[in-house]
């Protein structure tokens, strides 16, 4: 079995989740058994995974595993289905707060029932109160309609411990909160009752997850692809039975991606890189990154270059949209609105372009990173006001329909500090969008081939970004030529092409695991 290790499958996905989904589809197409492992508990895990095309057969949640809820028939649970063990209760709807208030006949509160307006008022949680009006516990319900997590509260209204239960109410996992030396409430331990009823205790969720991975690995012979390094970078080096372990680099291994051989390490990969030879293989998305990893760390583990992006055949074979049918002047960026994306650089470039091409617009699609009180979003908004670009620069938020965005755009702009591949710019060229990017490691400076499907300009030179955009907007023939080049260059990421790269790794895994049996 192949396992892709992650924390979950959220509704708003990062490039890592999108890469997993593409890989899952590719492996399914080649009849390979595979599952996404989700370490963290989330009441909507199955709902969001199913919506993304991951059925329950291809999803393995750690909490599901112990709660016996890997496959459960869904039930639409509403307030009418709840039993509070009392009679003569009244229910008041506070629709503006998305909840019901449940009271005794004398007006004393029994519970607050929080519901999901987007899914027929399905119950999310119940906040339970004692006879003195004190909150004593909160019950969280899985989106499939059963109680899954109970949070117990202390007299000072803090979470004291949490329990995860089976659908029939048996507690199988607990965690505990205690005050540290500074008086701060801290999670101090985990308790597990495994499938045989044996009790185990762990100091951290990392140790619990390590135990779980060893149980999943069983007698060995499995392949684990670690997509979120910090979740199991050490655990995968301590599996008790043979397995083929893959450290997948989804971002720059260096803190300064432009100085990969000498800068401090990206803290997300620090442990893994310092223990690089404890993994069976290392995967990078570009040859440039693979070469840099080899040059700095000299691994004896196998290294493979495998693009994380896959362009479906139906996209490669779709009718091409000419520049004449696109909105003239439309520039797009599809990325988290986060500090490392430096979208303010792109706004500065658009301001320069607008002086000569008044039709230009910049539409930014992506969810807003809350770091430093949404600093990146505020920078874009502040520059938009400073340059009087209201209605020209537009923050559009997250979208699930990027195809429509790309099919109407002429240019994709990218000004990041670093990337691990950048699925968005790969998807953009597959729709004929011309890329204009900084010479940034890793991905954009490989996906965009300077002079063929766009332009790669000097790092940090937003003036050059503006100049290249102006060159394209002022020369329709050049824009069309570059768009044609974009369509053609996307064939590098066809399913067949990417599969050939994965097949090399899988062949090595088969040989390695066969050797471990001797």
List PLM regions with ranges.
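A short, well-ordered alpha-helix in the C-terminal region of glycosyltransferases
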Residues: 405, 464, 478-492, 501-504
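Aromatic "clamp/platform" in nucleotide-sugar-dependent glycosyltransferases that forms part
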Residues: 398, 417
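A short, active-site helix/loop in glycosyltransferases that binds the activated sugar's phosphate group
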Residues: 275-303
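Acidic anion/phosphate-binding donor-loop and adjacent secondary structure
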Residues: 257-260, 309-328
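Nucleotide-activated donor-binding/catalytic signature segment of Leloir-type glycosyltransferases, i.e.
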Residues: 377-397
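Conserved acidic donor-binding segment of nucleotide-sugar-dependent glycosyltransferases
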Residues: 449-451, 455-462, 470-477, 491
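Conserved donor-binding/catalytic core segment of Leloir-type glycosyltransferases
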Residues: 322-341, 347-350
């Amino acid at each position: 079995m192949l396992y892709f290790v992650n924390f979950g499958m959220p509704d708003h996905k990062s490039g890592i989740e999108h890469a997993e989904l593409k890989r899952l589809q590719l492996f399914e197409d080649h009849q390979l058994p595979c599952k996404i492992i989700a370490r963290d508990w989330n009441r909507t895990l199955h709902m969001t995974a199913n919506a993304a095309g991951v059925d329950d057969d291809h999803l393995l949640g750690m909490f599901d595993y112990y709660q016996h809820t890997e496959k459960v028939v869904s039930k639409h649970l509403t307030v009418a289905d709840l039993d509070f063990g009392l009679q003569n209760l009244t229910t008041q709807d506070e629709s503006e707060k998305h909840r019901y208030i449940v009271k005794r006949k004398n007006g004393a509160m029994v519970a607050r029932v929080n519901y999901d307006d987007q899914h027929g008022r399905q119950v999310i949680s119940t906040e339970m109160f004692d006879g003195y009006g004190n909150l004593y516990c909160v019950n969280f319900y899985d989106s499939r309609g059963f109680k899954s997590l109970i949070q117990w509260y202390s007299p000072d209204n803090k979470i004291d411990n949490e329990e995860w239960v089976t659908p029939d109410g048996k507690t199988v996992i607990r965690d505990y909160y205690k005050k540290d030396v500074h008086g701060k409430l801290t999670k101090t331990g985990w308790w597990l009752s495994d499938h045989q009823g044996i009790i185990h205790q762990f100091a951290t969720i990392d140790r619990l997850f390590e135990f779980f991975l060893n149980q999943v690995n069983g007698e060995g012979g499995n392949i684990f692809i670690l997509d979120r390094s910090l979740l199991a970078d050490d655990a995968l080096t301590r599996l008790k039975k043979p397995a083929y372990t893959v450290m997948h680099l989804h971002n720059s291994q260096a803190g300064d991606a432009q100085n990969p051989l000498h800068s401090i390490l990206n803290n997300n990969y620090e442990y893994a890189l310092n223990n690089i030879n404890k993994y069976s293989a290392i995967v990078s998305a570009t040859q440039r990154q693979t070469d840099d990893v080899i040059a700095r760390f000299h691994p004896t583990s196998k290294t493979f270059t495998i693009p994380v992006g896959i362009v479906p055949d139906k996209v490669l074979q779709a009718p091409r949209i000419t520049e004449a049918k696109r909105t003239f002047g439309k520039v797009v960026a599809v990325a988290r609105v986060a500090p490392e994306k430096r979208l303010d650089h792109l706004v500065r470039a658009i301001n320069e372009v607008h002086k000569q091409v008044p039709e230009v617009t910049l539409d930014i699609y992506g969810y807003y990173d809350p770091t430093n009180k949404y600093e990146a979003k505020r920078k874009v908004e502040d520059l938009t006001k400073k340059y009087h670009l209201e209605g020209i620069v537009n923050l559009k938020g997250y979208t699930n329909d990027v195809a429509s965005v790309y099919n109407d755009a002429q240019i994709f702009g990218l000004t990041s500090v670093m990337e691990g591949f950048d699925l968005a710019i790969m998807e953009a060229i597959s729709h004929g969008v011309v890329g204009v990017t900084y010479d940034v490691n890793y991905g954009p400076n490989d996906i965009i081939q300077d002079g063929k499907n766009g332009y790669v300009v000097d790092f940090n030179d937003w003036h050059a970004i503006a100049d290249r955009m102006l060159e394209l907007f002022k020369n329709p023939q050049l824009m069309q030529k570059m768009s044609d080049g974009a369509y053609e260059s996307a064939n590098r990421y066809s399913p067949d092409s990417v599969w050939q790269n994965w097949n090399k790794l899988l062949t090595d895994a088969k040989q390695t695991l066969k050797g471990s049996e001797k």
